[in-house]
């Protein structure tokens, strides 16, 4: 390719210029890679985290800026007295997870719940397509969404909405005796594609 830029330069006639091959990894490729590690009988946190780090590296500061702007736009439709809390939680635990994942080398390496992992594929692919913005070329928002859900569920073993997340009515995600409870979990129980089905929190009793 570079030789063709200087076809009349005799000094370049016998110059051996190596071919440069650029590999462009698309966000949707993550599902192919997830399927690959799913073929194993046992999947460790190290294997999954390595894959998540790989895809975090193709998320640029500009992608994070666009994702933050999108969440702020969606926040306009949240109740006014709940809006700032909503944005604080989602920006911190959604957008900022990318840096946390890249920096995370301190975790207990053990096998993840393979059955839940395998069952998550259709749900995650649905969410990926649902969150895609076709007006933005190679929109990374769906990728951030998927990475965050997998990281929180299988690496941290925490609910997708972090403890303390407040919902309208002053209801919150809670942890009691090592178990996680969400006040709105059952609202999505009939929606098989809801991300809540991946979340390990249980419905808060009595609500």
Label every PLM stretch briefly.
Residues 7, 11-14, 21-24, 30-207:
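Cysteine-centered metal-binding/redox modules
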